[in-house]
Amino acid sequence: MAGKRSRCSFSRLELILIVCLVLMISLTVVLLVLHFLSRNTNDCIDNIAEKAKYLVGVGRADCTGPVAQVPLMGYANPEQVGGGLLSRLYSRAFIVAEPQGSRRVVFVSADIGMVSQRVRLEVLKQLRSKYGELYRQDNVILSGTHTHSGPGGYFQYTLFWITSRGLIQPTLKSIVNGIVKSIDIAHENMKKGRLFINRGTVENSQINRSPFSYLANPQSERNRYSSNTDKEMVLLKMVDMEGHELGLISWFAVHPVSMNNSNHLVNSDNVGYASYLFEQEKNKGMLPGEGSFVAAFASSNLGDVSPNTRGPFCANTGESCDNPQSTCPIGGASMCMAKGPGKDMFESTRIIGQNIYLKAKELYEKASQEVTGPLSSAHQWVNMSNVSVELNATHTVQTCKPALGHSFAAGTIDGVGALNFTQGSVEGDPFWDQIRDQLLGEPSNETKACHQPKPILFNTGEMTWPHPWHPDIVDVQIVAIGSLAILAVPGEFTTMSGRRLREAVQREFDSHGSPGMNVVIAGLCNVYTHYIATYEEYQLQRYEAASTIYGPHTLSAYIQLYRGLAKAIALNGTQELSPGPEPPVFNVTSLTLLPSLSVESAPAGKTFGDVLEEVRPEYREGEVAEVTFVGANPRNSAENATEHNFLTVERYSNTSSSWRVVLNDASWDTRFYWSKGTRGRSNVTIEWHIPAGTEAGVYRLRYFGHYKKRVNFLRVISVPFEGSSSAFQITAP
């Protein structure tokens, strides 16, 4: 028996084979499970990605307008009239749409001082004629970068005519057509894409220009923040489904006033320079203003934020004037001016712009948080001169008819006023009040009481000749792109005003089932209503408070209104919002003091485009190549050509025996100066500030223009011409 094997027993070899078989079966089962789990998971991810896809389109178009004889918009200085070009102005448009639905939103950032009501109404009118109800007042945001170096004259309200010589049709037309064209380009190039958001801190690029006003806010509130400015940049990155780069929008709070009020060259200032750097980086080998990648550096709550980081100094003595009234011992407020980080305004513009660009580049490269979810938009027109604000269960207050205080005329440390006004004025000046009463009429007791403690200089809400001086009907608007909520605000919110608005809207979303929204403020949108200071800042009546035109409760009114829009979006109830009273359209097309274009002439023995002062034969990098031509009024070109170049820098190619354009007038390395002479004559000077790294070789500078020529007694025509410098050599360093 001992030698017999049991029926249930197996040899060692058989046991090994059985174990191997079991292991193989188990492994096969595991692999099959993993395969199907992986496939199901991938299918799920693919489905999520498919649902998360948007249609994305980007576009850029020129909106420069006339670069000569038109006052620049921003500093309200009638002496600051355009006299040439440093950089072109662009409208940058971004469209996001749901592939399977009709919902879409448009965000436009334009290199202009602010979006006026007239610009918005004209843009919406053109969009309606092209696209029907696809692009409307609720889903189109128009935002200005707030450059103070763009042509003025695109407003329909009387106050803005005073320093811009009325309504300037060429400016209005250029801005409107440029915005519409940028939207057209974005519309035509829509493709499936993805959006990513990122945020980070920008250092060494801003200061609070009214720090004493900021200190009036509750200490408990101020203790929650490390700075008296918002240093955070929010960036939205756009790519297509293959990962190809499309563009970006950056929101950051800083005034584009690195170029001061002595400047006469049209340009887009520090944020425009940031756009230029980013677009040149992404559109390799393209001229400035060309290429498919679009980078917008949009405005935010910049009301009290200056790029002039060295702070205010007395221009005559050099001592600091960082005091509550921003005044100097000798010369008063007119001598107190802030300084940027550079040796001059051109270098300061580049330094601040590059700081902003470098942070945006870092955030762009690291952006990984995807924006997903439905699109929504909410909009209302509101009569801001008569909003009831519920502060709490027992207290209700009112906004006021628009009015500007005495400190409005004082200007800021970025651009001082022309007369003996000072910031922080809580009492009127009998001299100026008497002049106001005689010329414009005394403010009503009701308006005076409503605006307390503001001493009223211009009671614009009660001034209606020849048209109202300020808007009553104002746009409030929120656009939601998934988890991103863009608050389109109609003016310049101060740092703390912006923080309060964002927090209030964030809480509203949170409490109605939409937690975790990324809330950003887009400034200078849709209609311009000056500044929005907090109630506490308003009591000190520095410039920003004196320019809070609807009274001390303006911010509270906006918070109430934007909370209502956020609630409607969160509850999918935007259709139930009352549209409100539509804004008026005034017939102001012929109200202008801009000089008419007249017949021009060249000096004896010369013709248009001839060289008057020639370039040198040789230059090195870091030097300035300069040539002066017999010129003509640049307004002729603006009114007779689209996206016309006034100049080119060209390099000679030995291989092709031809000249190749290497720079145009959108470059920040070139400058175009126009100077008007007598008897219909004028000169044009072109400068090329040769940057480091310029390739050695043979170059020339070319000039393009139009002059007015009389054909007969009744007819004047524009004649194109061009000129060229001699060839010159750039030698290796």
Summary of predicted features, one role per range:
Residues 2-733:
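Non-catalytic substrate/cofactor recognition surfaces at enzyme active-site rims
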